[in-house]
A protein has these predicted regions:
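Active-site-adjacent structural elements that line small-molecule/cofactor binding pockets in enzymes
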Residues: 1-266
Length: 266
């Protein structure tokens, strides 16, 4: 299903991660509909093969097959994974999958990607877990391969697919963010983001990218009310706030309050 991007974007955007666990797919599909109707800007899932919380053997669905369905179901929101594990797919294949979902959605895919961390996924699906260092090195090698594949594809992506990289390692991960990302998803509180944002900009200067203006800062705000932290987020330069919710109920009450706060910013 094609969609048309809005002519302008709000100062801060709101994303929700619908964790594909402990729910039937009908419940997930309904949550996507409700989230888009609420006015969120981005709907994410995640890229795991088992639940991360609750019953470790509970119901769960795969990331990219789901994104293809969301691309058809939705009309306005951007969609993506928060985040895809680089280890699970050859970079060229991942580029092709992303390009395909980009076309299905009419140019609304964000490629969220990270180095990977959840060992059970690796062990049960036959991937080599390695070490944090080897997984980060693999991510660094994958990013130019993904972009090179996009440049070679026929048809090309409908747009320059935005790349979101998740992680906060100050020496290696933030260097990869500086080199390749359009969005950086940080973990932790506002002060952590502010400090690491400065480090990111140092990496940006080293590689010749103005990351202060070219890389949107994203931060999770689970359990936090906009009236409590919203002003600090704006002061820190956050451009995307994300919230997460799990099945089977997919409670969007806090998400709705953040959408109202976003709209009040003008």
């Amino acid at each position: 299903m094609t969609g048309t991007a809005a002519p302008s974007q709000p100062r801060v955007r709101v994303g929700v991660q619908l964790q594909p666990q402990h729910a039937g797919y009908g419940q997930i599909r309904d949550a996507v509909l409700r989230a888009e109707d609420l006015g969120v800007d981005v709907i994410f899932n995640w890229d795991h093969f088992f639940p991360l919380y609750g019953d470790p053997d509970g119901r769960h669905f795969e990331c990219w097959t789901m994104l293809g369905a969301w691309a058809e179901q939705t009309e306005r929101v951007e969609i993506g994974a928060l985040v895809t594990c680089n280890s699970y797919r050859n970079p060229e294949l991942l580029a092709d999958m992303a390009r395909t979902v980009d076309h299905i959605s009419g140019g609304r895919l964000i490629l969220g990607i990270g180095a990977g961390w959840f060992q059970r996924d690796y062990d049960e699906y036959g991937y080599e877990f390695g070490t944090p260092g080897t997984r980060i090195a693999d991510l660094a090698q994958a990013m130019p391969r993904i972009r090179a594949r996009w440049a070679a594809m026929n048809p090309a992506p409908t747009r320059d697919i935005p790349v979101m990289i998740g992680g906060g390692g100050e020496r290696k991960t933030l260097r990869i963010v500086a080199e390749h990302a359009d969005v950086w998803h940080s973990f932790g509180d506002v002060e952590t983001l502010r400090r690491k944002s400065g480090i990111l900009d140092e990496h940006g200067a080293a590689v010749g990218r103005d990351t202060a203006s070219l890389v949107t800062r994203s931060l999770g705000v689970d359990g936090q009310e906009p009236g409590e932290v919203g002003a600090d987020l704006l002061a820190a330069g956050v451009g995307l706030v994300t919230l997460s919710t799990s099945g089977p109920d997919y409670d969007l009450g806090l998400v709705e309050r953040w959408v109202r706060w976003r709209d009040a910013q003008g």
